UniProtKB/Swiss-Prot annotation:
Probable cyclin-dependent protein kinase (CDK) inhibitor that functions as a repressor of mitosis in the endoreduplication cell cycle. Acts as a potent cell cycle inhibitor. Expressed in root meristems after induction. One of its GO terms (molecular function) is protein kinase inhibitor activity. The keyword Acyltransferase does not apply. Coiled coil: none annotated. It comes from Arabidopsis thaliana. The keyword Cell cycle applies. GO terms for biological process: regulation of DNA endoreduplication. This is Cyclin-dependent protein kinase inhibitor SMR4. Keywords: Cell cycle, Protein kinase inhibitor. Induction: Up-regulated by double-stranded DNA breaks-inducing treatments. Up-regulated by DNA damage. Interacts with CDKA-1 and D-type cyclins. PANTHER family: CYCLIN-DEPENDENT PROTEIN KINASE INHIBITOR SMR13, CYCLIN-DEPENDENT PROTEIN KINASE INHIBITOR SMR4.
């Protein structure tokens, strides 16, 4: 008879939320800091020992056109 009473009590109470610590949401922990950028190692390069290469026909490739005047 006790089994029938328990089922009846459960049916009357309805659904309930579990309250055990096993079912609780854990407390939020502190997030780790964001990753840092790597430091850029800037090293000034020395000019080449033999100097820079200057081809004799460089001006023919990069011809500078004269600027046009605006019409007024």
């Amino acid at each position: 008879m006790e089994v029938v009473e328990r089922k009846t009590e459960m049916a009357e109470e309805g659904c309930t939320t579990p309250r055990s610590t096993m079912y609780r949401i854990p407390v939020a922990s502190v997030c780790p800091p964001p990753p840092r950028k790597k430091l850029m190692v800037v090293r000034k390069r020395d000019p080449p020992r033999n100097g820079y290469f200057q081809p004799p026909d460089l001006e023919t490739l990069f011809y500078a056109q004269p600027r046009r005047e605006a019409c007024a």
